Amino acid sequence: MATQRKHLVKDFNPYITCYICKGYLIKPTTVTECLHTFCKTCIVQHFEDSNDCPRCGNQVHETNPLEMLRLDNTLEEIIFKLVPGLREQELERESEFWKKNKPQENGQDDTSKADKPKVDEEGDENEDDKDYHRSDPQIAICLDCLRNNGQSGDNVVKGLMKKFIRCSTRVTVGTIKKFLSLKLKLPSSYELDVLCNGEIMGKDHTMEFIYMTRWRLRGENFRCLNCSASQVCSQDGPLYQSYPMVLQYRPRIDFG
């Protein structure tokens, strides 16, 4: 009876490494047009200079290829389980970056309990549940009410009394909409648009994704983000700003 061959991690390398940086896929992001997957940082940087897929050369989008990107959380979990220590390395890298570059405008003390990185040596899921993502990298956001004269719903959607919030970079636009609906006491059927720099954001976009692909392009007071060990650092690497990111909200506009 033939013995079953034991597979090594290197056997899966063609499926779990990035075509651009040649390292393991970090936050694997798939191009929906051709289904090729890259590190999120790598593909975002590539699309700043080109609208074509770096692997097959097909045009992804005529004007905004970033709209055709989707995070692959399932593949991310598979890679973390295949490669020992990769998850811990990435969490430590993110934590170190946000400790050095977290915004100061929200008035919170640097040494506050919410900002301290928490070490989970046992990987206890119960501790993660109690944490409510407080040990995630944090980002300061300003939620500004966008008023259009004469638009239906302007009397319902008001500005927040406290429009500055601090949340995890993994929070999605969908969660922000739920937060706004709760604070503004909107009916469950009432829908909002959330915008950044005048562009409507998709409900699955995370704050980190919007920060990197929309807000930082405004071009003032940039700070460099240290690349991970699997990527090549350059002067054109990912950049972050030091002041709160502004998101605007308004009643949903039906374009018919």
From Swiss-Prot:
One of its GO terms (biological process) is positive regulation of transcription by RNA polymerase II. SMART domains: RING (SM00184). Its main location: nucleus. Keywords: Metal-binding, Nucleus, Repressor, Transcription, Transcription regulation, Zinc, Zinc-finger. GO terms for molecular function: histone H2AK119 ubiquitin ligase activity; zinc ion binding. It is found in: Nucleus; Nucleus, Nucleoplasm. Gene3D superfamilies: Phosphatidylinositol 3-kinase Catalytic Subunit, Chain A, domain 1, Zinc/RING finger domain, C3HC4 (zinc finger). CDD domains: RAWUL_PCGF5 (cd17084), RING-HC_PCGF5 (cd16737). Residues 94-133 are annotated as: Disordered. It comes from the Eukaryota. GO terms for cellular component: centrosome; Golgi apparatus; nucleoplasm; nucleus; PcG protein complex; PRC1 complex; X chromosome. A zinc finger (RING-type) spans 18-57. InterPro entries: PcG_RING_finger, RAWUL, Znf_RING, Znf_RING/FYVE/PHD, Znf_RING_CS. Residues 94-103, 110-120 have a biased composition (Basic and acidic residues). PANTHER family: POLYCOMB GROUP RING FINGER PROTEIN. Component of a PRC1-like complex that contains PCGF5, RNF2 and UBE2D3. Interacts with RNF2; the interaction is direct. Interacts with CBX6, CBX7 and CBX8. Interacts with AUTS2; the interaction is direct. Identified in a complex that contains AUTS2, PCGF5, CSNK2B and RNF2. Component of a Polycomb group (PcG) multiprotein PRC1-like complex, a complex class required to maintain the transcriptionally repressive state of many genes, including Hox genes, throughout development. PcG PRC1 complex acts via chromatin remodeling and modification of histones; it mediates monoubiquitination of histone H2A 'Lys-119', rendering chromatin heritably changed in its expressibility. Within the PRC1-like complex, regulates RNF2 ubiquitin ligase activity. This is Polycomb group RING finger protein 5. It comes from Homo sapiens. The lineage of its organism: Eukaryota, Metazoa, Chordata, Craniata, Vertebrata. The gene is PCGF5.
